[in-house]
Amino acid sequence: MTTLTLPAVAKLNLFLHITGRRADGYHNLQTLFQLLDTGDELHFTRRNDTNINLSCSDASLVNEQNLVLRAARLLQQHTGCKLGCDIVLDKRLPMGGGLGGGSSDAATTLLGLNKLWQLGLSIDTLAELGLSLGADVPLFVRGQTSFAEGVGEKLQPINLAEKVYLVVTPDCHVSTAEVFQHPDLIRDTKEISLADLHSSSWHNDCQPLVERLYPIVAITLQWLVQYAPSQMTGTGASVFAAFPDQTSAQHALAQLPPSCRGFIAKGVNQSPVWAALADTE
């Protein structure tokens, strides 16, 4: 095998509770990660030298800080692999939307090159490597909808009803660092257990602050809540609502304000990347 095409799916935070601040400055979180069946796509072509090249449908994303390049080089360095690759990233998810696109791209790169380079690393090893790139990367490496704790890296897989979601992203880029450093951020939500999950009140502790700092997020939520209960994912700017069926979601999408991007996706308990990898066996 010399080529491989794999999806890099989005996620939603069905809730995001901040339960405290750690000594290292990071925050302890509890969240429910819902994987979606929609996202970016990556095309890998193996090279017989050690060069790693990236091209992207959005040329502005091709730089040394891109998580795809960082993931590929990390894997190469960790294993001493003498192969390289050409990677094409078809970027479909909005940047800075709270949908995990960059982390998902990194995870798919680790999974894809582990296969293409025939490295044979375990999922645990790939998840550990991924954590050094970002707290959400292990979620996408493991590829299961999960209840998460810690900084988001302690994952317990969970099966949820696979609902239809409308995801809407207003025209703004929320700074995650600004949100988590802000003195007004809620940081004392009471911890819940997995057993308490369905009897607890779900909310996003970042949402009140983000709505204040980025009024367009509040306006977008006010629009979406006309159709279904709505909330923000991650630190925004994307917001979402669950719908009973595709038709009702399409009706709302047809009324989308011109300043927003939107898409409909289905929640899935296992990432499509696993089916795509299995198809290469």
Residue locations for each model-derived region?
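Hydrophobic C-terminal alpha-helix "anchor/cap" residues
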Residues: 33-36, 130, 224, 256
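Glycine/serine-rich anion-binding loops at beta->alpha junctions
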Residues: 88-117, 229-243
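Short, basic/glycine-rich phosphate-binding loops at helix/coil junctions
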Residues: 48-61, 109, 131, 195-203
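ATP-binding N-lobe of GHMP and related small-molecule kinases
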Residues: 1-96, 115, 119-124, 151, ...
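Residue-level signal for inorganic ion chemistry
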Residues: 14, 42-44, 68, 102, ...
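Solvent-exposed alpha-helices and their adjacent loops that cap or buttress functional pockets
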Residues: 34-35, 131-132, 139-141, 157-161, ...
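Conserved, helical-rich catalytic subdomain that frames metal- and/or nucleotide-binding sites
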Residues: 142, 146-229, 242-281
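Contiguous, small/hydrophobic- and glycine-enriched helical/loop subdomains that border
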Residues: 84, 110-147
